[in-house]
């Protein structure tokens, strides 16, 4: 046999896959697929939990805010404080969980303290002002009108996300935004009003303008949070999410407390408690649980930004807005009419459209990952065999 023939045989043998090596590759590929499937399952489990936090927290907190005003509460700054001051309930969980996540959170470059403080202060100031504007709107507007204007936060968020987060507005997403907005818009045509205190035309206009501004501010805050995770903090992990919630809430709470004392509303709190319709205990419990439920909403909203995007977080928030009139049927004995039913159906339809878009994105990402894996070059076994023959 000539040297050329021997070399051809060796090259052919090198091209033929080694059964042992092939089995190892199949085993590795199978393990990677199982890990990927497990991670996807855990991710969507977290998304489901965060979604429940957003809807339940926002719904209960809004109902409690309405109860506070309807039963004699009148302090706009106190209503702002309770939206923000509940963050200390997270500290025990944050401390206990820090050690568990510390090993993975130390990887990567550290953000400079100056940039980190700047992010928390700017977002905290915006959140504090935003919550105050929402408090004014809830005081002067009917729930149906308030829900209508709050739905506009989704459009504002889509606008800011397009410029700040490079969010692609696909036809499915646009359909989702349209349906979610219409679902809350229908509530404006509801002629049935609650027994809330009558307001003047000037107060109504003030509440309308403040709620529009608050909706725009909320959409901006969500986009800025997502931008901060990607560009400034440059890490998306448990610690960053908890730090974002706690420190932003701390700054915003300081802003609201300063506003409470600067406006002199704190002087009327004692008489407000004494004259509260259901007594002092009910007054205190209302404030405490309002603070807790708003913090649950904050956890869910920030978690959805961390897992998906600010636009998805806002879509879930808008989905929960029609739930408030539904619960009002049970709590305040309001009547359920056709508009409320249609509103809920459209909200669920819009939410389903957005989830379907997320499913398509994940499917395409997984397909691209599989293509990249299959196109990776094999180890140069043939070359090694050839050089050994020489």
From Swiss-Prot:
The keyword Kinase does not apply. One of its GO terms (molecular function) is purine nucleobase transmembrane transporter activity. It holds the Pfam family PUNUT. Signal peptide: none annotated. It is a multi-pass membrane protein. The chain crosses the membrane at residues 44-64, 78-98, 117-137, 140-160, 169-189, 204-224, 241-261, 287-307, 312-332, 336-356. It is found in: Membrane. Residues 370-390 are annotated as: Disordered. InterPro entries: PUP_plant. It comes from the Eukaryota. One of its GO terms (cellular component) is membrane. Keywords: Membrane, Transmembrane, Transmembrane helix, Transport. Belongs to the purine permeases (TC 2.A.7.14) family. This is Probable purine permease 10. It comes from Arabidopsis thaliana. The lineage of its organism: Eukaryota, Viridiplantae, Streptophyta, Embryophyta, Tracheophyta.
